[in-house]
């Protein structure tokens, strides 16, 4: 019994180590291929439109209502200690530092990551990736690099827009629901907001963009055969991206805001 358990644990450990090694090599090849010509600008522009512009409505709606709910919940808690004046500060700092980047990252991971993994996995199953080799085209350069570049560029833009919309949601709730003074609320919003708060969110967004794109491309590129392989690749891309987003969010916060 114990021998079987040890054997099972050993197999999974070796399999995990192999997956990590393959992923590290895949990431290294993708990063090194980015600086090599050609750039495939048309593919990059297409991915910029898909990852950035098409994700904007979902990100905007999510951050708007997150900011609104954050204002309501903060008022409920702070009113017990007569600290209602801190609501605007809590909303803007929470959104710029944490909620904005994390929510946008998870949304893009679910929407874009699944699509990227499914698309590349389908190309793998239908042997379109092999066809690129016959045309003397590097599939990683052609399929992976444009998506990685586009994700790194668009994620900070999505987060920045989402932060503004989220603060606007908190502002509207504060003014029209909680009856705050407009000038006082805006003053409190920007009083304690520092450049590092915004920069930290953009740094996180850039890292999240790389994580989502590289994991999704990896999941699709090394997918199994048939429809089941495509489904597993899609699920793996979303789950692994979401987990790494949360882990890297903590590590970046620990690095930038040392307590």
UniProtKB/Swiss-Prot annotation:
One GO MF term: phospholipid transporter activity
Cellular component terms per the entry's GO annotation: ATP-binding cassette (ABC) transporter complex
Entry membrane topology: Multi-pass membrane protein
Keywords: Cell inner membrane, Cell membrane, Membrane, Transmembrane, Transmembrane helix, Transport
InterPro entries: ABC_MlaE_roteobac, Permease_MalE
Protein name, per record: Probable ABC transporter permease protein RT0041
Main location (coarse class): membrane
TM ranges: 20-40, 49-69, 148-168, 195-215, 237-257
Family statement: Belongs to the MlaE permease family.
Disulfides per UniProt: none
Subcellular location: Cell inner membrane
Chain's role: Could be part of an ABC transporter complex.
């Amino acid at each position: 019994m114990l021998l079987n358990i040890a054997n099972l644990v050993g197999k999974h450990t070796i399999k995990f180590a192999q997956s990590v090694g393959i992923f590290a090599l895949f990431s290294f090849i993708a990063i090194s291929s980015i600086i090599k010509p050609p750039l495939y600008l048309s593919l990059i522009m297409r991915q910029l439109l898909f990852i950035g512009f098409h994700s904007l409505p979902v990100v905007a709606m999510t951050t708007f209502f997150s900011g609104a709910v954050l204002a309501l919940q903060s008022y409920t808690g702070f009113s017990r200690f007569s600290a209602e004046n801190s609501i605007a500060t809590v909303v803007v700092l929470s959104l710029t530092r944490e909620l904005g980047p994390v929510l946008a990252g998870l949304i893009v991971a679910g929407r874009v990551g699944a699509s990227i993994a499914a698309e590349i996995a389908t190309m793998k199953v239908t042997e379109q990736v092999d066809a690129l080799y016959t045309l003397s085209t590097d599939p990683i350069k052609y399929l992976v690099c444009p998506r990685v570049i586009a994700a790194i560029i668009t994620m900070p833009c999505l987060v920045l827009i989402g932060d503004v919309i989220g603060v606007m949601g908190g502002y509207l709730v504060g003014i029209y629901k909680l009856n705050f003074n407009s000038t006082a609320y805006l003053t409190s919003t920007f009083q304690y907001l520092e450049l590092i708060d915004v920069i930290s969110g953009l740094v996180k967004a850039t890292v999240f963009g790389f994580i989502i794109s590289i994991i999704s491309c990896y999941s699709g590129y090394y997918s199994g055969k048939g429809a089941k392989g495509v489904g597993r690749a899609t699920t793996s891309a979303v789950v692994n991206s979401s987990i790494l987003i949360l882990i890297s969010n903590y590590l970046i916060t620990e690095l930038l805001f040392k307590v």
